[in-house]
Amino acid sequence: MSPIIASEHLSNIALGYVDSVDSEYAKRLAKKWQFNYLGHVAAASKQPKLEFMLQMHHHALELCKLDEPKLGAIKVDFVEGAVAHRRKFGGGRGQDIAKAVGLKHGFKPHVLDATAGLGRDAFVLASLGCKLTLLERMPVVAALLDDGIERAKLNHEVADIANNMQLIHGSSLEEVDLAIEPDVVYLDPMYPHREKSAAVKKEMRIFQSLVGEDLDADDLLEPALALAKYRVVVKRPSYAPPLANKKPSMSINMKKNRFDVYVKQAIPKPIT
């Protein structure tokens, strides 16, 4: 099959499959997200301009950096691994992120995660009962996240959580349908981290080479404040300045990060 013509900014990436059982699904994904369709991943060796490859492998979508194969592949997995461990043993409503968004007895906010990425924090909030709308502007990241959510819906342990997560592929907060009416807008813009775990270092390296620096992060705060009903929560490294240098209403400090909380109005107390 000849490759599907993709938009110019995606010319350095293609989508293929490892096992033929995934070939039809890989074709559908390439068409849905407008990626070049590669066919079998072995064909990448004949296309020297390719820098990245999305591959269907064991029924999951993965991202690889072709010139650094030792980095391995990135995929979204809400069923096993670190995300599953955090869901089971992460501390429930006592977690700092739950406090930051105002989650409490009788109030489970609708959270718009406007920098969804791989969806880890969104999944934590969804597992605590929040309704999540996820906004991701990069098609590669959105495709990975969408695949992870859809696979999670097929797993009986996390299907209810995944069904609480709605993904929007869009370029900006200004484009978000006002009918969504989030209680809280959550922001976690990319920021150069000093200390990284091996996994985070791998992901940051691949994503920064793929999407570049997050130069417009400061521009997120004002539209987020306009959209949120009660508050905006910004996750920052502990050493980073506040987003747009705007002092938050309060901060929740952790070991390496903090949550800056910008309160618009008090969350109403539940009626008892």
Curated annotation (Swiss-Prot):
Keywords: Cytoplasm, Methyltransferase, rRNA processing, S-adenosyl-L-methionine, Transferase
Entry annotated with the keyword Thylakoid: no
SUPFAM superfamilies according to UniProt: S-adenosyl-L-methionine-dependent methyltransferases
Gene Ontology CC annotation, any one: cytoplasm
Binding site for S-adenosyl-L-methionine: 120-121, 136-137, 171-172, 188
Single annotated GO MF: rRNA (guanine-N2-)-methyltransferase activity
Family that this chain belongs to: Belongs to the methyltransferase superfamily. RsmJ family.
Statement: the UniProt record of this protein carries the keyword Methyltransferase: yes
Protein name, UniProt field: Ribosomal RNA small subunit methyltransferase J
